[in-house]
């Protein structure tokens, strides 16, 4: 029997971080959600914890107002403590799991992982919600112990409602860590687990980005509009009503471009590499 996750940390209070936080709380997990101190505060503003915690508190507030609802019940938000990475990082001690959902930037992630390694209890599982950055690149400079307890846990938006959870192990990830997070994902979070390899954009985004990019290219070749495409690629094809372009909007065009660029740069030998070039529009 694997140990359940009772306490977790979430780093990053944006759309994904706040969604992960809310669903952890839905599953009965006590959550610490931290974000950076907002830049540009005056010296007087820096003295007020409410100002310093503004990003994390805003993420919690956004989750409480989210539609569709992120929490099963708003009272579950009582399981969440918010703070910032400068003043409150010690709150992560005692966590079974800490997951980051910050910007997809190697340098920023590496800096965070260094800080976590210097703070967390030995054996704490650390996960990244990256949509496709390579584990080996993110963990440059980290210890053997840290790498052993590290994996990718890639949730999809909106976290409460999307069944898929991708788990990806690094070369040195302990199989017991993968087992524990599989049980956590299936039994506590109610997710369907897909185990991917540490390849560009894993499984879901690799397929989804290819499909979306190919659809956009075909639209341009056929002289269609986004409205035309969505009328075809939604319910008439057995797909959700969000179809193609509404799905792209929901995912975020900036996220879609990041995933496309990552695939294009990494898949140098793929015969269909050019599909991942985002259209000029």
How would you label these PLM feature ranges?
Residues 1-281:
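N-terminal glycine-rich phosphate-binding loop for ADP-containing cofactors
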């Amino acid at each position: 029997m694997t140990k359940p996750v009772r306490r977790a940390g979430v780093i990053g209070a944006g759309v994904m971080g706040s969604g992960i936080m809310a669903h952890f709380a839905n599953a009965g997990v006590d959550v610490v959600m931290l974000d950076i101190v907002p830049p540009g505060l005056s010296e007087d503003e820096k003295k007020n914890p409410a100002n310093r915690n503004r990003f994390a508190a805003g993420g919690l507030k956004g989750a409480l107002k989210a539609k569709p609802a992120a929490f099963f019940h708003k009272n579950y938000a009582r399981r969440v403590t918010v703070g910032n990475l400068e003043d409150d990082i010690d709150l992560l001690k005692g966590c079974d799991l800490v997951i980051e959902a910050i910007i997809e930037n190697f340098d920023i992630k590496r800096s965070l992982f260094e800080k976590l390694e210097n703070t967390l209890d030995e054996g704490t599982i650390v996960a990244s919600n990256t949509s496709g950055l390579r584990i080996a690149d993110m963990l440059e400079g980290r210890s053997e112990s840290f790498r052993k307890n590290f994996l990718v846990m890639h949730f999809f938006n909106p976290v409460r409602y999307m069944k898929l959870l991708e788990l990806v192990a690094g070369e040195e990830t302990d199989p017991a860590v993968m087992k524990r997070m599989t049980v956590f994902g299936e039994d506590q979070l109610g997710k369907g687990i897909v185990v991917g390899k540490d390849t560009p954009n894993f499984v879901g985004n690799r397929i989804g980005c290819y499909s979306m990019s190919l659809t956009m290219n075909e639209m341009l070749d056929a002289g269609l509009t986004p409205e035309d495409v969505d009328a075809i690629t939604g319910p008439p094809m057995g797909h959700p009503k969000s179809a193609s372009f509404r799905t792209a909007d929901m995912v975020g065009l900036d996220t879609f471009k990041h995933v496309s660029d990552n695939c294009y740069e990494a898949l140098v030998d793929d015969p269909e590499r050019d599909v991942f070039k985002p259209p000029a529009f």
